Amino acid sequence: MQFSKMHGLGNDFMVVDAVTQNVFFSPELIRRLADRHVGVGFDQLLVVEPPYDPDLDFHYRIFNADGSEVSQCGNGARCFARFVRLKGLTNKRDICVSTANGRMILSVTDDELVRVNMGEPNFEPSAVPFRAIKAEKTYIMRASEQTVLCGVVSMGNPHCVIQVDDVDTAAVEILGPIMESHERFPERANIGFMQVMKREHIRLRVYERGAGETRACGSGACAAVAVGISQGLLAEEVRVELPGGRLDIAWKGPGHPLFMTGPAAHVYDGFIHL
């Protein structure tokens, strides 16, 4: 099986063309391939499949390193767009793909950055899903014998955003896994730790569902900005500084889609016998 190794700001992926190859990935195989000692090593596996609808270009599937399938990955979407162009699967600059929960438009710019229409953030608890009586801008939760104030949103996957004074000293390794599996998130959640530098600039660390802390999380950056705007903390255009680098997020507010712009890097191509 042929594959490519790619990354978006250090969030790394194994990308596989299932348009011209017959492939099947069991959870056991994914976990073995994800192992950085005996496999390829990656945060997520991205699979390019033929479209299910003639109006679409491809179907986009995402698997975490633990073998679970998820419905959204913003950094992966940028790598997906670069991959299908690099491999000659399309020469379009605007690529329309389906995911497990909807559609996305991926636009490759002249300088090879990728702009992704991530859709409109959804703050309804049932959409996240999150156990709450009604939607709130800020929720009070108990975790590890402490009170946590957070915002909750779906970007096609569940996100919880916690504002902190300093991301460098935030208890990501302790609070991340506790909040990820909190009983109020029936499908678990991605946990963002956001430091507001000014209205146009935040710093962010993300503990990803099924992957742990990664160097960058595209949908996490989108979620942090969406929550920050909803809470009146941020402007419509925000620079997000992650451990792996920078993303630019733009959202005009309710009724509008959110856009993410950032790089996607091809590392190498490989072949593996399964």
Swiss-Prot record:
Q: What class of enzyme is it?
A: isomerase
Q: Which GO terms describe its cellular component?
A: cytosol
**UniProt entry keywords in alphabetical sequence:** Amino-acid biosynthesis, Cytoplasm, Isomerase, Lysine biosynthesis
The protein's predominant localisation is cytoplasm
State the family named in the UniProt similarity comment for this chain.
Belongs to the diaminopimelate epimerase family.
Cite the NCBIfam families for this sequence: DapF
Q: What is this protein called?
A: Diaminopimelate epimerase
What is the gene name? dapF
